[in-house]
Amino acid sequence: MASVHEKLISTVADCAPEQPRNKVTVVGVGQVGMACAFSILSGNYADELALVDVLEDKLEGEMMDLLHGSVFLKTRKIVANKDYSVTANSRIVVVTAGARQQEGESRLNLVQRNVNIFKHIIPQIVKYSPNCVIIVVSNPVDILTYITWKLSGLPKHRVIGSGCNLDSARFRYMMAEKLGIHASSFHGWILGEHGDSSVPVWSGANVAGVCLKSLNPNVGTDKDQENWKDVHKQVVDSAYKIIELKGYTNWAIGLSVADIIESLVKNLGRVHPVSTMVKNMYGINEEVFLSLPCVLNNCGVASVINVTLADDEVAKLRKSAETLWNIQKDLKDV
């Protein structure tokens, strides 16, 4: 007797299932990982989404929760497993897993613990998806992007740190709020190391091509009577404030990662301030990753925009590079 399926559906052609073209994997299903996953699904940037974590129950629960929203999504396949074989043939892999800093722990010790975690994660990613682009989100992101590059053996253009893409978005939002315009209409960049020592590029900050420096030569400096410099301090402090209020940050970084992924999968050639190898740029001689304006397309970082920076901005970039290198040079097993 024919089944309901056989009575309902008549096969016209036996088509072999093809490999996904835009498969995205998210490693780590914590608050940040799931915000990335949700933003990727909402933007319809993947034809398959894979989730990986060591916590099997949470992993299965998150997958089920997303699958139950399938009617509202355009990503047909969502899979999850602690085994990295589930990530096979990924075009992009987003790494959000990592150790959190413990009270009183040195930055070097935190990074070394993350090296040990990444030594398990990164080779597995490359084993199953040797042609992927890796986006590192885990903090400290610039050092962990360097570690990922070293452990993966991938060319530098295919290892990207989320870097200052979010810092710049926060900067644009806060500056636009003060000016009474939409965030997308203020053009400004934060470069260098993600976080406390990031570098606001006041020399290029503009609205409709009108540089703020041309209106106030002291903008962003200690001599500025309008104290625009305080906006960058708010950008740096904002993550701490959110963590104080809700315990973690996740939505904005999730949206930021999805923004980067859109440029990659759609081959857009958009410019993003993301973490990339900066050796031999701006007088930096060490192998460190910092955020510079990068053109992103389907191969990863296609090129870097050579921004003309003020002398003090270059000095701050070099200082960031020196700080990172002083930690990296003492790492073991990289």
UniProtKB/Swiss-Prot annotation:
Record's keyword terms, sorted: Cytoplasm, NAD, Oxidoreductase
Binding site for substrate: R107, N139, R170, T249
Catalytic activity line of the entry: (S)-lactate + NAD(+) = pyruvate + NADH + H(+)
Active site: H194 (proton acceptor)
GO CC annotation, single: cytoplasm
EC numbers, comma separated: 1.1.1.27
Subcellular location: Cytoplasm
PROSITE patterns on file: L_LDH (PS00064)
Enzyme superclass (EC): oxidoreductase
Molecular function terms from GO: L-lactate dehydrogenase activity
Positions that bind NAD(+): 30-58, 100, 139
Pathway(s) the chain acts in: Fermentation; pyruvate fermentation to lactate; (S)-lactate from pyruvate: step 1/1
GO biological process, one term: lactate metabolic process
Family membership: Belongs to the LDH/MDH superfamily. LDH family.
Assembly and oligomerization: Homotetramer.
Annotated HAMAP family: Lactate_dehydrog
Role summary: Interconverts simultaneously and stereospecifically pyruvate and lactate with concomitant interconversion of NADH and NAD(+).
PANTHER family per UniProt: L-2-HYDROXYCARBOXYLATE DEHYDROGENASE (NAD(P)(+)) (PTHR43128), L-LACTATE DEHYDROGENASE B CHAIN (PTHR43128:SF2)
Protein name, UniProt field: L-lactate dehydrogenase B chain
Gene this chain is encoded by: ldhb
